[in-house]
Amino acid sequence: MKLAYWMYAGPAHIGTLRVASSFKNVHAIMHAPLGDDYFNVMRSMLERERDFTPVTASIVDRHVLARGSQEKVIDNITRKDKEQRPDLIVLTPTCTSSILQEDLQNFVARASISSDSDVILADVNHYRVNELQAADRTLEQIVRYFLNKARRQGVLTRSLTDTPSANIIGIFTLGFHNQHDCRELKRLLQDLGIKVNQVIPEGGSVEHLQDLPKAWFNIVPYREVGLMTAKYLEREFGMPYLSTTPMGIVDTAEFIRQMEKYVNSFLSKEKVNYESYINYQTQFVSQAAWFSRSIDCQNLTGKKVVVFGDATHAASITKILVREMGIHVGCAGTYCKHDAEWFNEQVQGFCDEALITEDHTEVADTIARIEPSAIFGTQMERHIGKRLEIPCGVISSPVHIQNFPLGYRPFLGYEGTNQIADSVYNSFTLGMEDHLLDIFGGHDTKEVITKSLSTETDLTWNPESQRELNKIPGFVRGKIKRNTEKFARQEGITTITVDVMYAAKEALST
């Protein structure tokens, strides 16, 4: 446990609650002190949904500490069972309430006796795993529980659907553009004549989990959540799964070819061939292939960027920038330390260096050192970019409300390639616009203000040097200011004059 100004992945119980609240008619009870119960507020604010968040906090207060939690937890479970009539109640502690070392499994067993709903305790080590790992584990636990239940009742069958079908595993609440990605995946599968058997956990019913084995194969669009479930289904039922993320033209084509291979492995007579579909989509539907050859995109060739996010999005965006747009990735990084080996394999040869860290200050220092033309990252990298006056495109969770758009903005599939191309192009400062505004003023009559880029206050710019700095085009002003301040510190100068500016320029060019 640690005190942090910013966390890329939250505590484990958030992952469990995200999965539980994604299913239909599943209620979660969080055994937690006040302060840990912010999930309801966070989800209600960010997700554009009309329904209430199905999570109840069983508060650990002084009475609980004096008498124990058993009575309160069991009362909350039985009350919610009678009020909500859920198919499943998931009990989860938080890392704080886990300190009490209570036998919550016993509470669940006691509550199950008088409840009509199924009741389970989230099987997660709250000290060892983060939000994403806990979500992956909880989803697998729920799927395993209901498939075992169906097997005991004798209603579990492996009879495949008549036509090609797939399960989409890992779409869930508070995910980065997950709802849009799901729609795009469904459209892609429909175009190829593949039926969607089930989508879990988002909008799925635990009562229908027994039908998961009827699909021909599983699709795991994001490595962070769903991989454990897919591996479990492969072990138990021999179901193949695709973990290639269909992001960008190259990987989307590879994803479709893998589906073709899986579908043909089940067909005995008429085999399918999706190559004509790939060619048509690449040439006429996706604008990204055409855009990458346009003069606008060629202006970005060789520009240096930094990419940081979850393993899936950071790796995919890195490959898209290099392979499809000719952009130079100075550093690609992820906060998914548990998936570092896979990430390093994916970005090898596509970037100058890889960064695996959960420390936002390390990311900020790397960005300041590389001085990229643009950043592609999370909400935190956007804050860093604003401070350093470097534009940032948001490509991964964690994000704030502006990245839960009402409009249709997928990142997967062929429509996703258009969205990514737009996001990349619009993230770069196109120089000339700022330059013309600096020269002619535009409609903005304010004096140009140069933001301070450093947190240190040991340097001052006199009025003449400030005016000289304001004459420099905006798209390079920040870099010149940083270089001048760096030179001044090296030389022990505290007041920056015009002469110091020119001396810094001369020192840099020699």
From Swiss-Prot:
Q: What is its EC number?
A: 1.3.7.7
Cofactor binding, per record = Binds 1 [4Fe-4S] cluster per heterodimer. The cluster is bound at the heterodimer interface by residues from both subunits.
Q: Where does substrate bind?
A: 431-432
Q: Which pathway does the UniProt entry assign to this protein?
A: Porphyrin-containing compound metabolism; chlorophyll biosynthesis (light-independent)
- Enzymatic reactions: chlorophyllide a + oxidized 2[4Fe-4S]-[ferredoxin] + 2 ADP + 2 phosphate = protochlorophyllide a + reduced 2[4Fe-4S]-[ferredoxin] + 2 ATP + 2 H2O
What InterPro entries does UniProt report for this protein, alphabetically?
ChlB/BchB/BchZ, LI-POR_suB-like_C, Nase/OxRdtase_comp1, P-CP_red_C, Protochl_reductB, Protochlorophyllide_Rdtase
Q: Which Pfam families match?
A: Oxidored_nitro, PCP_red
Compartments in which it is found: Plastid, Chloroplast
- The UniProt entry annotates the active site at 296 (proton donor)
The principal localisation class reads: plastid
UniProt key word ATP-binding = yes
The record's annotation in Gene3D superfamilies points to:
1.20.89.20, Nitrogenase molybdenum iron protein domain, Proto-chlorophyllide reductase 57 kD subunit B
Sorted alphabetically, the keyword list is: 4Fe-4S, ATP-binding, Chlorophyll biosynthesis, Chloroplast, Iron, Iron-sulfur, Metal-binding, Nucleotide-binding, Oxidoreductase, Photosynthesis, Plastid
Gene Ontology annotations of biological process type: light-independent chlorophyll biosynthetic process; photosynthesis, dark reaction
Residues annotated as binding [4Fe-4S] cluster: 36
Q: What are the recorded GO MF terms, alphabetically?
A: 4 iron, 4 sulfur cluster binding; ATP binding; metal ion binding; oxidoreductase activity, acting on iron-sulfur proteins as donors; oxidoreductase activity, acting on the CH-CH group of donors, iron-sulfur protein as acceptor
Q: Which GO terms describe its cellular component?
A: chloroplast
What function does the entry list? Answer: Component of the dark-operative protochlorophyllide reductase (DPOR) that uses Mg-ATP and reduced ferredoxin to reduce ring D of protochlorophyllide (Pchlide) to form chlorophyllide a (Chlide). This reaction is light-independent. The NB-protein (ChlN-ChlB) is the catalytic component of the complex.
Q: Which family does it belong to?
A: Belongs to the ChlB/BchB/BchZ family.
Assembly: Protochlorophyllide reductase is composed of three subunits; ChlL, ChlN and ChlB. Forms a heterotetramer of two ChlB and two ChlN subunits.
The molecule here is called Light-independent protochlorophyllide reductase subunit B
Identify the coding gene.
chlB
